[in-house]
C-alpha cells in the first residue's frame, strides 16, 4: 500500500516552486544591513487609533485620500494593499487564467513577479533587457500572444536605472487592448520626475505599483499601493482580502502621508541621494571594484573582481550586501543599499582592505 505524504497532496506547481529569497530569509548575523534597500534608521510614530476590537476598513479613507493627493491622482484610482507585493499578486489573480494566460517581465529585475505567477499556476515569459538594461521591444512584441500582464520595474531593481519613457509609450501601444502594463515604481521617490502617474488618463491599461517601504522608511509596516484607472481598481477590489491593512498600519500610513510626513520623506530622500553620490565616488577608487553603475535609487549596483570572495569577506565582518551573481547579465555584481555615513565608511574600509 502506497503512502501519500502531505507534500504529495500539495499542488504540483507549489512542490516545484523556489520561494523568493528575501533579505530576511537569507539571514546573516551582521550589524550593517545593506541588502534590503531599507532606510537605515527608524522613524518614530505614535498610534492614535485604539479601537482594536473592531475590524479595520478594507480601504482606509484617510490613507487613500492622502495617497491620492500625494500621487496626483483621484481617490478612485488608488488601492492600498499589504505591501506592493500583494499588488503584484492581485493583478495576476484578477487578469490571468491559470493554465491559459501568461505574464511577461524583463530580467534582470525583481523576483516576486515570477514567484507570484508560479504560485497561482500562471505561465512566466521572460524577455531579457538589452545590454544597456533597456527594454527589448521587438523581443517583447514577439512574445505578447497570450500575455495578460507585463511587469516593468522603473527604476529597476537591482540595476538602478530608469526605463526610457519613449519605450514605455511604445510598450503601452503594443499592449493596448491586449494586456495590462504594470510600472513598478517602488523607488520613484528618488526620481519623482520619472513617474508615469500622469499617464493614467491616456492609457486605461496602465497600472502603477508604489510602496511606503523605501523613501517613507516603513518597510516593517507592509503598506503598498496600486494606481490605476477605476475599472482596474474595481476588478482588484473583487480579489483583495477583506482587511488588507490592520488598524495600526492604516494609522501610521495616514500619518506618513500627511503634509508633514511628505516633507520629512523628501528630506530623507535628499540625504540618501547625497550619501549615494559619496559612496559611488568612493567605490570608483577601490581596485577590487571593476564597475559602478549609475543609480536613480537608494542602492548601488557594482561589479567586483572575485565578487563571491568579497561578499563572503564582508559577510564575515557583519556587513551584509545582496549577491546578484545569479541574475542574468549580472555576473560579478553585488547590490549595496545606501545607508548612513558610518555604514558607508564601514563598506569602504572593508573593500579597501580587500585590495591588499
Curated annotation (Swiss-Prot):
It catalyses: L-histidinol phosphate + 2-oxoglutarate = 3-(imidazol-4-yl)-2-oxopropyl phosphate + L-glutamate. The modification N6-(pyridoxal phosphate)lysine is found at residue 214. This is Histidinol-phosphate aminotransferase. The keyword Amino-acid biosynthesis applies. GO terms for biological process: L-histidine biosynthetic process. The lineage of its organism: Bacteria, Pseudomonadati, Pseudomonadota, Gammaproteobacteria, Enterobacterales. Pathway: Amino-acid biosynthesis; L-histidine biosynthesis; L-histidine from 5-phospho-alpha-D-ribose 1-diphosphate: step 7/9. CDD domains: AAT_like. Keywords: Amino-acid biosynthesis, Aminotransferase, Histidine biosynthesis, Pyridoxal phosphate, Transferase. It is an enzyme of class 2 (transferase). Its cofactor is pyridoxal 5'-phosphate. The gene is hisC. GO terms for molecular function: histidinol-phosphate transaminase activity; pyridoxal phosphate binding. InterPro entries: Aminotrans_II_pyridoxalP_BS, Aminotransferase_I/II_large, HisP_aminotrans, PyrdxlP-dep_Trfase, PyrdxlP-dep_Trfase_major, PyrdxlP-dep_Trfase_small. Belongs to the class-II pyridoxal-phosphate-dependent aminotransferase family. Histidinol-phosphate aminotransferase subfamily. Homodimer. It holds the Pfam family Aminotran_1_2. Its EC number is 2.6.1.9.
Amino acid at each position: 500500500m502506497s503512502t501519500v505524504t502531505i507534500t504529495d497532496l500539495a499542488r504540483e506547481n507549489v512542490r516545484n516552486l523556489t520561494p523568493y529569497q528575501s533579505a530576511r530569509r537569507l539571514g546573516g548575523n551582521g550589524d550593517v544591513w545593506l541588502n534590503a534597500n531599507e532606510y537605515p534608521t527608524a522613524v518614530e510614530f505614535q498610534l492614535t487609533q485604539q479601537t482594536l476590537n473592531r475590524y479595520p476598513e478594507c480601504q482606509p479613507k484617510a490613507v487613500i485620500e492622502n495617497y491620492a493627493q500625494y500621487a496626483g491622482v483621484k481617490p478612485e484610482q488608488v488601492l492600498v494593499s499589504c505591501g506592493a507585493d500583494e499588488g503584484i499578486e492581485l493583478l495576476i489573480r484578477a487578469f490571468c487564467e491559470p493554465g491559459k494566460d501568461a505574464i511577461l517581465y524583463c530580467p534582470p529585475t525583481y523576483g516576486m513577479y515570477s514567484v507570484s505567477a508560479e504560485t497561482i499556476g500562471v505561465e512566466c515569459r521572460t524577455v531579457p533587457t538589452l545590454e544597456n538594461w533597456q527594454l527589448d521591444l521587438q523581443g517583447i512584441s514577439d512574445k505578447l500572444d497570450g500575455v495578460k500582464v507585463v511587469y516593468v520595474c522603473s527604476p529597476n531593481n537591482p540595476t538602478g536605472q530608469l526605463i526610457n519613457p519613449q519605450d514605455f509609450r511604445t510598450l503601452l501601444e503594443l499592449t493596448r487592448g491586449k494586456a495590462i502594463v504594470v510600472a513598478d515604481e517602488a523607488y520613484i521617490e528618488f526620481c519623482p520626475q520619472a513617474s508615469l502617474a500622469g499617464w493614467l488618463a491616456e492609457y486605461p491599461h496602465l497600472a502603477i505599483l508604489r510602496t511606503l517601504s523605501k523613501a517613507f522608511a516603513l518597510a516593517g509596516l507592509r503598506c503598498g499601493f496600486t494606481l490605476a484607472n477605476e475599472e482596474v481598481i474595481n476588478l482588484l477590489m473583487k480579489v483583495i482580502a477583506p482587511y488588507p491593512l490592520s488598524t495600526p498600519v492604516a494609522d501610521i500610513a495616514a500619518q506618513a502621508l500627511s503634509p508633514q510626513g511628505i516633507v520629512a520623506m523628501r528630506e530623507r530622500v535628499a540625504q540618501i541621494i547625497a550619501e549615494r553620490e559619496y559612496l559611488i565616488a568612493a567605490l570608483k577608487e577601490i581596485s577590487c571594484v571593476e564597475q559602478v553603475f549609475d543609480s536613480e535609487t537608494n542602492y548601488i549596483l557594482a561589479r567586483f573582481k572575485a565578487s563571491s570572495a568579497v561578499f563572503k569577506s564582508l559577510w564575515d565582518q557583519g556587513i551584509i550586501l545582496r549577491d546578484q551573481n545569479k541574475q542574468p547579465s549580472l555576473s560579478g555584481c553585488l547590490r549595496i543599499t545606501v545607508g548612513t555615513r558610518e555604514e558607508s565608511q564601514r563598506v569602504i574600509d572593508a573593500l579597501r582592505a580587500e585590495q591588499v
